[in-house]
C-alpha cells in the first residue's frame, strides 16, 4: 500500500455543444423558418470528500481528467444533451490549490462535501434564437464555449484533535497503541513509522478524540533531513500537540538535548505552529529508578524553560496514560465551549490556523524548489557543501512515497 499526500493533476471541463443551423422543411409549407436547436452544456468537474479514502494514490499515476463534451443541437428545435459531470473522490482533509495562481480553491473537511473545480462550457445557440421580425431566415449560430482547464495541486492533511511530536523511538507509536485500537508498527530502530497513523481514543461512553502520529523528527528536519518535515503539515489542523520525550534513551544521549531539538525544529518549520497549545509528555519512566524520575523531569523542564503541563508516563506499561487521556478530553471540551461562548477567542484561533497553513505551505514550497534545483543539477546558495541527498529524492516528483510491505 502506498501513502501519497501530495499530487498534481490537470482537469478539463467539457466544452459546450455547438448550436444548429436548420430550417423547417415540410410539404406544402414554404419558408418554414428556422428550427435549429441549442447545444448542450459541457460537463463540469467536482471533487467530493470521501471518508473511506485515506490517500491520494489514485491520482499518482492518472493525472489528466476530462469531463464529457455537450452534444451539438439538432433540427426540429432539439437541444443537445448535456455533458456528464465528472466526480473525483478524495480523502477528507484534502486542500485543492490552483497550481498556477497558488489560490486555495477549497478545503474539503467533511464527508460528502462537494466542490466544483472546473465549470463546463456554456452551450452554443441555434439559429432559432436569432429569428426576428426583420430576419425571418437567420443563418447565424454560435459555437459552444470551452470548458475550464486547470492545473491543480491536491494536499492531504489528516484531521485529528491531538498530534504527537518527538524524535524517532520516543514512543509515539507505542503511545497510540496503548490508548487506542490503532496498531502501528513498533520496533527498536529509528523511523519505524513511515506514514501518519490515526487512532481513536475512547475516554467515556460517547466521548472520544483522534490522535495523529507522524514520523519522528531529527535535527535539521526543517532543512529537509529525515522524514518528519513533510508530515508536519498534518499537525496543522490539530487542536493540541503532545511533545513526547524519551526519558531513558537507549544510546544514552541527553534527554534535554533531544527535547530541545524538537522545539527548535518546530519553530523553524512554523513559528505559528509552535504557538499551538502543547503539553510535555515524558515517556518510558519505567526504564529509570523512581527516585531518579523527578530529577530527570526537572532537568528537561529547566532546559526548555517549560511552564505548561507536564506528564510522566510509560506508554508500554500504560502507566499514567489514562489520566493523560482524560485531561486531554477535558481540555478539548473546554476549548470547544470557549469557542462557542467567546467570538474573540474563536477569531484568534482562526487567525492562528491560517498563519500555520501559510507558513507550512511556504516552507514546503521552498523545499520543493530546492529539490527541483537538485534535479536540474544546480545547487542553491544554501545547499553548498550539503551532500545529504540521494538519487531517490530525484525520482520522487510529488514528495514522499512510502510502500508498506506486509510480512
Swiss-Prot record:
Family stated for the protein in its record: Belongs to the TRAFAC class OBG-HflX-like GTPase superfamily. OBG GTPase family.
Originating gene: obg
Functional description taken from the UniProt entry: An essential GTPase which binds GTP, GDP and possibly (p)ppGpp with moderate affinity, with high nucleotide exchange rates and a fairly low GTP hydrolysis rate. Plays a role in control of the cell cycle, stress response, ribosome biogenesis and in those bacteria that undergo differentiation, in morphogenesis control.
InterPro entries: G_OBG, GTP-bd, GTP-bd_Obg/CgtA, GTP1-OBG_CS, GTP1_OBG_dom, GTP1_OBG_dom_sf, OBG_GTPase, P-loop_NTPase
Protein name: GTPase Obg
Acidic residues composition-biased segments: 385-400
Region (Disordered): 127-149, 376-407
Domain Obg residue range list: 1-159
